[in-house]
Amino acid sequence: MTARGNLFIVSAPSGAGKSSLISALLKDKPADMQVSVSHTTRAPRPGEINGQHYHFVNVEEFKALIAQNAFFEWAEVFGNYYGTSRHVIEHTLTQGIDVFLDIDWQGAQQVKAVMPEAIGVFILPPSRDELERRLTGRGQDSKDVIDSRMAQAVSEMSHYKEYDFIIVNDDFDTALADLRAIIRSQRLTGASQIHAQNDMLNDLLAG
């Protein structure tokens, strides 16, 4: 019997390494894990593929999905809408596949309200100085933009207590191992094992 997959909410301030950790976790395309593909109204960027990076829809289509209660969570960011499909998540979880939501604390609160069993993981940088170094090191933004992102990062980090697990991304390999350990631990809970090993348990306890 296939155990239901777990829903992991992964949040972090910009520069904490969240996207890199998720990419490393899934680089070998494991059959039992996948990242949720969000819907968005923004235009595709060069190289982005519809259905792989995002589900690209227009504003009218997105608002129709909101009216249908089709999203676990949705938000408007810089004039564009983003949302997580309720149907896709539920279907994937019933197949025994763990799903990762790469969303902020506001989205996490929305998901937790409808699926309290979702597992929250917050990624932190080892220090404020290191976070600023990472943001500056990208070499793509002005000081004003970096200052704005730092302020936004501090605001985001203030919600770390709302999550079930906290990973400090000081050493990348250690942080990745920590993330894998969290996933493994959730697959070994009593509820998960009872479901996954139902036939074996019945056989062991047969009179």
From Swiss-Prot:
Encoding gene (name): gmk
Similarity section: Belongs to the guanylate kinase family.
Keywords carried by this UniProt record: ATP-binding, Cytoplasm, Kinase, Nucleotide-binding, Transferase
Name of the protein: Guanylate kinase
Cystine pairings recorded for this chain: none
Cellular compartment(s): Cytoplasm
Catalysis performed (reactions): GMP + ATP = GDP + ADP
Function: Essential for recycling GMP and indirectly, cGMP.
Alphabetical list of InterPro entries matching this protein: GK/Ca_channel_bsu, Guanylate_kin-like_dom, Guanylate_kinase, Guanylate_kinase_CS, P-loop_NTPase
